Structures are given as structure tokens and as C-alpha cells.
């Protein structure tokens, strides 16, 4: 099954994923997407744990900076970057696969 770039590119955020996944059988693309969903869930959990560990002044925006805050920001960047890739995979695949919660 070849996907039409014209149909996908209107909503895709990460164009390199179109080329990387071009020609893949739908089952392989679904496997990649399911793995990306699981990765995203782990990253969300990690970022949330780091946020919850921040002092209240950081959570409310009254303070910022320092190693602990930087670790949270880096985890959030990683989580959001993964979400962009995941949204692109959803667009290419054409649906959101069901994934059992671990």
C-alpha cells in the first residue's frame, strides 16, 4: 500500500517520517506507531514525575532554573518531540491504533 504524499503532507508535522516510512506494509507502520505510543507514555510519566518533584514555587512559575528544573524541561522537550512524531505517524497510518495500558 503506497500512501499519497499529497494527502498526508497537509497534516503531517515531520516530513522526514513520510520518506522513512514510504513503502512499509501497513502492519509494520502500525507496529512502529504502537511502539511510539508506548514510548510517549513512558516519557509523559517521566516528565510528570519530574514535575511533581519540583518545589511548589517552580510549579507555579514563581521560580525557575537550576538542575532540577532543567531536568524537567529536558524531559518535557523529549516528550513533546515524541508527540510530534507520534502525530505524524497517526496521519500517515490514517488511524490511532488501540494499545493496551501496561
Curated annotation (Swiss-Prot):
Q: Which gene encodes it?
A: traM
Pfam families reported for this sequence: Prok-TraM
The lineage's top-level taxon is Bacteria
- Which keywords annotate this record? Conjugation, Plasmid, Repressor, Transcription, Transcription regulation
In terms of InterPro entries, this protein maps to: Tscrpt_rep_TraM (IPR015309), Tscrpt_rep_TraM_sf (IPR036336)
Q: What is the lineage of its organism?
A: Bacteria, Pseudomonadati, Pseudomonadota, Alphaproteobacteria, Hyphomicrobiales
Name of this chain's protein: Transcriptional repressor TraM
Residue spans crossing the bilayer = none
BP GO terms, sorted: negative regulation of DNA-templated transcription
Q: What is the recorded function of this protein according to its Swiss-Prot or TrEMBL entry?
A: Negatively regulates conjugation and the expression of tra genes by antagonizing TraR/AAI-dependent activation. TraM may either bind or modify TraR or AAI making them unavailable. Alternatively, TraM may bind tra promoters preventing TraR activation.
Amino acid at each position: 500500500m503506497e500512501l499519497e504524499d499529497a494527502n498526508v503532507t497537509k497534516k503531517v508535522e515531520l516530513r522526514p517520517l513520510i520518506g522513512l516510512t514510504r513503502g512499509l506494509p501497513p502492519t509494520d507502520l502500525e507496529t512502529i506507531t504502537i511502539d511510539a505510543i508506548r514510548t510517549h507514555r513512558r516519557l509523559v510519566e517521566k516528565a510528570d514525575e519530574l514535575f511533581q518533584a519540583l518545589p511548589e514555587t517552580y510549579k507555579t512559575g514563581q521560580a525557575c532554573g537550576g538542575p532540577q528544573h532543567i531536568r524537567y524541561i529536558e524531559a518535557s522537550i523529549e516528550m513533546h518531540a515524541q508527540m510530534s512524531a507520534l502525530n505524524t505517524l497517526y496521519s500517515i497510518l490514517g488511524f490511532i491504533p488501540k494499545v493496551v495500558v501496561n
